[in-house]
């Protein structure tokens, strides 16, 4: 099926260049033709950048600098039998353009060097190859300065104003529908094709118990409706440790391809969920809630979104490198249930 999608697309769009990590000459020619590099910077070295699922992301190392090329194709790169919205990379580029004048936001993101709308390619500054924050799941901690920096970025994002004429650009409806399916629907579907016991023995039984909780499923559905609301705030849409990159001078935020105009509570909830999944201390969680309170956001929605994100990362398709057995995963599903059904208890379930 994956080869079918590629072949069908290539036949229908013969004028679109599909980047190939193994074709260095073609990539050098692409960059030269767009005046993004000079002859004196070549030859280059081309390699995959990161372990992202959605897109082809390449690091092009030149004589004295490096670039990131990111191309979204109409399939999920790691699961190329799954179709995905082709416009996502262009919308991500529009996010970079929209925040450019707000230095507290753009200064903590790679610089956008070019958008190729025909081939759906972004050319970005290389934020560095020292890794992202997914080591949190092993380390079970995040430093207070790092957490403060991440929350300051979210606060600054809340100050970004999108002009009326740009509003439709950021509906990002196709990507939001895809995300909605994988966050709010698929994990709790009775027959979703996931063999959870292959991931962790006993996880299928734990998931079945949660799926039988009608109140929980109803509240998740309501939160899914809230996620689909068109709001006035620019939302990153995937604010988790894989989108936080360690650079020499601090943190860089990447991959806003799921961005949309909606409710800010979603980003805070996702962030809170990953602190729970990393088993970070309750003080870190309190810091997130204190920050959302300062932004006058709805606690019930932040906590609810956190609960849903915990569940989808445990029993959904988008698995994480979690070093836990079934007892810890059952406990985390209980945390999710409490956050969704009893948000008035706030962090009483946290441990």
Feature-to-residue mapping (PLM):
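Active-site catalytic-loop/activation-segment of kinase and kinase-like phosphoryl-transfer enzymes
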Residues: 2-22, 168-223, 315
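Active-site acidic catalytic loop and adjacent metal/ATP-binding pocket
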Residues: 47-69, 217-266
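Regulatory N- and C-terminal appendages and interdomain linkers associated
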Residues: 1-47, 319-351
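ATP-binding pocket architecture of kinase catalytic cores
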Residues: 49, 58-169
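Short secondary-structure junctions
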Residues: 35-42, 103-108, 295-296
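Low-complexity, highly charged intrinsically disordered N-terminal segments
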Residues: 2-5, 56, 72
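Active-site activation/catalytic loop segments of kinase-like enzymes and analogous catalytic loops
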Residues: 94, 264-296, 306-325, 339
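Active-site Asp-x-Gly
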Residues: 78-88, 232-234, 245-287
């Amino acid at each position: 099926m994956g080869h079918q999608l590629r072949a069908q697309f290539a036949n229908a769009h013969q004028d679109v260049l599909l980047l190939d990590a193994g074709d260095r000459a073609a990539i050098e020619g692409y960059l030269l033709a767009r005046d993004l590099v000079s002859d004196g910077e070549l030859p280059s070295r081309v390699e995959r950048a990161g372990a992202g699922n959605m897109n082809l992301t390449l690091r092009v190392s030149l004589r004295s600098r490096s670039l990131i090329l990111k191309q979204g194709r109409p399939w999920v790169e790691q699961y190329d039998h799954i179709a995905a919205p082709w416009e996502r990379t262009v919308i991500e580029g529009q996010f970079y353009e929209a925040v450019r004048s707000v230095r507290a936001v753009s200064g903590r993101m790679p610089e956008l060097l070019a958008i190729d709308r025909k081939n759906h390619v972004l050319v970005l500054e290389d934020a560095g190859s020292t890794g992202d924050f997914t080591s949190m799941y092993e380390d079970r901690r995040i430093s207070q300065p790092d957490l403060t920096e991440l929350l300051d970025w979210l606060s600054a994002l809340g100050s970004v104003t999108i002009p009326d004429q740009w509003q439709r650009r950021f509906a990002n409806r196709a990507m939001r529908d895809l995300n909605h399916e994988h966050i709010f629907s698929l994990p709790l579907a009775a027959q979703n094709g996931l063999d959870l016991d292959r991931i962790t023995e006993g996880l299928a039984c734990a998931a079945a118990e949660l799926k039988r909780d009608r109140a929980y499923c109803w509240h998740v559905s309501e939160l899914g409706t809230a996620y689909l609301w068109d709001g006035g705030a620019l939302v990153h849409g995937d604010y988790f440790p894989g989108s936080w990159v360690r650079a020499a001078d601090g943190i860089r935020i990447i991959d806003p391809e799921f961005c949309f105009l909606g409710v800010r509570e979603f980003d805070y909830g996702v962030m809170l969920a990953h602190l729970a999944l990393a088993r970070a201390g309750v003080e870190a969680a309190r810091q997130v809630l204190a920050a959302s309170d300062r932004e006058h956001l709805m606690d019930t929605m932040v906590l609810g979104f956190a609960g849903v994100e915990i569940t989808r990362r445990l029993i959904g398709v988008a698995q994480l490198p979690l070093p836990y057995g079934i007892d810890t995963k059952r406990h985390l599903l209980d945390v999710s249930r409490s956050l969704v059904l009893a948000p008035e208890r706030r962090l009483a379930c946290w441990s």
